[in-house]
Amino acid sequence: MISYQTEGVKMPAIKRRETTAWIKSVAATYGKKVGDIAYIFCDDEKILEVNREYLQHDYYTDIITFDYCEGDIISGDLFISLDTVRSNSEMVGATYEQELHRVIIHGILHLCGINDKGEGEREIMEACENKALAMR
């Protein structure tokens, strides 16, 4: 089950049924099934608080993914800062909606085993994001 929640922000205008179906399709391309996934949309201050408390990182970010996957079942809590999504969309010349969908699927790709911190991994992640976005 995929749930969409907010903490301190208004729920973004996403089509939940379509988004859920899209997420399941993307996961299936990696041989994964969707378990329990919670999207928590929040502001910059909340994501900074989560980043400090659980990851000991003292910076803002667009998404934090807590991975609870077991085998081929992907599960996790995904915190998304709508403030950072908005500023990133302006920086990269994308619409807010485009950037939000990129970040939504970025977390799913992490749960599917795609990383973006090591040598060459950022490019692989971007290619996977683009492939997933084309499936929308």
Question: Where is each model-derived feature located?
Answer:
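An acidic/histidine-cluster motif and surrounding catalytic segment
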Residues: 1-101, 112-136
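Conserved ATP-binding N-box helix of the HATPase_c
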Residues: 109
